């Protein structure tokens, strides 16, 4: 085990000197299991792929985002911190982070964050300016923005479940009567869907024709609740407006560990989604190709350069899936 610490060297970001704490970065070693449903799985996840654990002892990690300059950022919600991983160590980017969850880089290096604490989406620019992008819809406060993605036009799509509210749907501070999927563009917020119970992860297809959203529905049984877990697909027009929607894939066994959370889409349109049993790999037609099983349930994931690496947040742990052919 190696421990990396920058001490008081710190990191200059957002106009403030921020200091790293000591975080353990494990010596990388293989872990996990590949469970193909068909041979097509190996066309997406090469047989030579290696799953490695690269960080431990966090509290609840989320929101990984890869920067083109070659580093990863992610959030630790209970720790109220956004970290950066350089390949050698972890440094604090922002603390407190207003319990940031989903993260996303814009052109120019702006970092967008879904904040549970402020119930908003904010933008942190390289010069340190923090700006609120959206915090309400039709005069009512958002619940707690969870995850987000953006189009080439600059539109931001995001989910707004109540996970950041202490009493969830029963919280007295909850203003909206639903948990929505939204689109923000040029200062205007549009409601895409108000019918999902627990919308969570969200991603766009490479051609931006489809928007995917993870969801969970609770089925009351009079005893222990059961769940429906499925992923929605929204068909978009050239302006990024929704024209149609349908269930893209429904998990057949929701008793397995893990649930519908974050996701990422590769350059060929294959989806990597956190779900029951691990990370489900789905092709662009919604066929389940196989599962990447982890010892800890994945919360979210993001591709590194050229789809050759997938960085996975899993509660206390950070994984890297190397997919060199």
Walk through the language-model features, giving the residues of each.
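C-terminal motif of bacterial Sec signal peptides marking the signal peptidase cleavage site
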Residues: 18-21
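Blade/loop signatures of beta-propeller domains
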Residues: 26-50, 79, 242
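A short beta-strand motif characteristic of beta-propeller blades
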Residues: 51-55, 89-94, 131-138, 188-193, ...
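Beta-rich, blade/repeat-based domains predominating
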Residues: 56-71, 96-115, 119-120, 138-156, ...
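Beta-propeller domains
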Residues: 71-94
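Short glycine/acidic-enriched loop and turn motifs that connect beta-strands
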Residues: 79-81, 118-119, 163-166, 218-221, ...
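Short loop/turn segments immediately following beta-strands, especially the blade-tip
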Residues: 233-241, 323-325
């Amino acid at each position: 085990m190696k421990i990396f610490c920058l001490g008081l060297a710190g990191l200059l970001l957002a106009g403030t000197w921020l200091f790293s704490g000591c975080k353990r970065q494990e010596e990388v070693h293989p872990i996990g299991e590949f469970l193909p449903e068909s041979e097509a799985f190996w066309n997406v996840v090469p047989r030579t792929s290696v799953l490695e654990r690269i960080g431990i002892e966090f509290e609840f990690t989320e929101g990984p985002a890869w920067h083109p300059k070659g580093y990863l950022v992610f959030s630790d919600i209970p720790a109220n911190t956004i970290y950066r991983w350089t390949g050698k160590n972890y440094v604090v980017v922002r603390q407190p982070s207003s319990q940031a969850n989903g993260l996303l880089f814009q052109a120019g290096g702006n970092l967008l964050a879904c904040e549970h604490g402020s119930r908003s989406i904010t933008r942190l620019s390289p010069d340190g300016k923090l700006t609120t992008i959206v915090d309400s819809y039709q005069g009512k406060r958002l619940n707690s923005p969870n995850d987000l993605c953006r189009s080439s036009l600059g539109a931001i799509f995001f989910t707004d479940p109540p996970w950041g509210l202490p009493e969830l749907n029963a919280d007295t501070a909850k203003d909206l009567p639903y948990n929505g999927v939204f689109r923000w563009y040029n200062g205007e917020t549009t409601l895409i869907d108000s019918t999902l119970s627990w919308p969570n992860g969200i991603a766009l297809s490479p051609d931006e024709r489809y928007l995917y959203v993870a969801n969970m529905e609770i089925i009351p049984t009079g005893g222990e609740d059961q769940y429906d877990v499925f992923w929605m697909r929204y068909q978009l027009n050239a302006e990024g407006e929704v024209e149609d929607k349908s269930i893209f894939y429904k998990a057949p066994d929701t008793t397995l560990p893990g649930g519908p959370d974050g996701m990422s889409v590769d350059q060929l349109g294959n989806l990597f989604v956190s779900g029951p049993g691990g990370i489900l790999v789905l092709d662009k037609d919604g066929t389940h190709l196989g599962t990447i099983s982890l010892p800890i349930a994945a919360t979210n994931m993001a591709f590194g350069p050229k789809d050759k690496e997938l960085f996975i947040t899993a509660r206390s742990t950070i994984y890297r899936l190397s997919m060199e052919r």
